């Protein structure tokens, strides 16, 4: 079996990068011949080339009509790889790379199977192009949450769709003592209640609703709430609108992008992922739980599938600052040590890489 993974993201890639890194290394460890094609400038390409330079190919996946020349160029590059490496399966991870792979298969009449993982929560459009893409040019589809599976409209596509929840590296993400250095760096006190998110800083991640909720607390509790956000810092306009205008600049900390998020997670009392769009299941949520941090999540898409409510975390209505505020007001009565132990226990039972890798390989067979 020769598998080619594809990914269109030219930058950091977020969850796509995590997913494909785990999967690529996982199938190689089981003696399956695997390759990956991704933009040369992408984090995924650079990371995987360090240990597997001959298995990583520089390919872009343009998708706009005005990019037709570049599309043709990359289709030709893709065809050469597929023929040379005798690829049986191309595992695509987004619509741009799926389109290019489809055109390559159609134009050159190549014989390989296409597996698609759907990483977002958007409904599949119903038009002639989507019918082709997800019909003839999708042999099997993987979704990472039950929510996505329920969103699949057609019976034909649902029959060839498998739910495989994301796995994480439990040897890498495990409980550790709070980082005193990071506490000092961000001037966080032992009496503070620290919320951390490593899910990113885009507004669709919903962090602004936690900030709003905290701003409405009484002065004593409000002063103790610290909200730490790991990821690229937002624009000054976003900071002004969602933080400064409600006088929360002393409560919110942007760390900037971190390759290793464990130090940041270590200082958390509670993790949070309050997404209002795009999200499916969230690697970040599972990573924080594996490190023994209970997580506050919104009920958007598949986020709630990570949590047993009021046992290893909490579920609130998406976009509801008022529900979050009610949660914050009862936080001093919670036994966070018990919640932390439950979160870590859940991760050991359900979030490991073994099932994730093995269940994906079953789709290939």
Language-model segment annotations:
Residues 5-13, 17-19, 23-70, 161, ...:
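N-terminal strand-loop element at the rim of the active site
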Residues 37, 294-297, 307:
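Short hydrophobic beta-strand element within catalytic cores of glycosyltransferases
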Residues 14-22, 193, 197-216, 227, ...:
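A conserved mid-protein helix/loop that constitutes part of the nucleotide-sugar donor-binding site
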